[in-house]
Regions:
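Extracellular structured ligand-interaction cores
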Residues: 31-37, 46, 93-95, 111, ...
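Non-heme Fe(II)/2-oxoglutarate
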Residues: 110-111, 115-181
Length: 181
């Protein structure tokens, strides 16, 4: 999916913010999920994504136990949070500055956030998520240190070569993020 992070805080009267600190596993509930991120234009350490490597195995208070994807997409609550929330760690995050066309793969359990600056330059990147069913079938995945959601959102992923494959059943393949998400 194409992600655009404007350098302005407001566009057409809407407040636009980069995504705050979060783990994607808080929403997906899938510990074996891998995120792929590719910038399309040059980055700076103030216009990029940041990660907190030291928080990978550190539990963080969050509201993943009560956050509900179905409530988000229902549109009934215009102020419903886009993702589970936490308090940003006191330690500084590490900015990711890679070249356009380089690809960053990282665990969905990695705490990360978006950054934008007032340079007037918007950030354009491509991101997607994948799950290898062999990892699921073998019980492999990142340590779940603090995700408390009760639902695994397999509907976010589509098997590219094995339509209808359900984790835990015979067959192996990579599940990639669905177009409709």
């Amino acid at each position: 999916r194409l992600r655009i992070v404007p350098s302005r805080k407001e566009i057409h009267g809407k407040v636009i913010r980069p995504l705050p600190a979060h783990r994607d596993t808080w929403g997906s509930g899938i510990d074996a999920q891998i995120n792929w991120w590719l910038p399309l234009y040059p980055l700076t350490d103030t216009r990029t994504m940041i990660v907190w490597p030291q928080a990978f195995r550190q539990p963080l208070p969050n509201d993943s136990a009560t956050w509900d994807y179905d409530a988000l997409i229902s549109g009934r609550h215009t102020d419903y949070p886009m993702l589970p929330s936490t308090r940003t760690p006191d330690t500084p995050g590490r900015p990711i500055v890679i070249e356009p066309g380089e690809l960053l793969a990282f665990s969905a359990a990695q705490l990360h956030a978006g950054l934008s600056d007032r340079s007037g330059v918007s950030r354009f990147s491509l991101d997607t998520r994948t799950v290898w069913t062999g990892d699921i079938d073998a019980g492999r995945g990142a340590p779940n240190v603090d995700a408390a959601g009760q639902t695994q959102h397999w509907e976010w992923f589509t098997p590219p070569t094995e339509p209808g494959h359900t984790p835990g059943t015979p067959g192996a393949g990579q599940l990639s993020e669905g177009i409709s998400q």
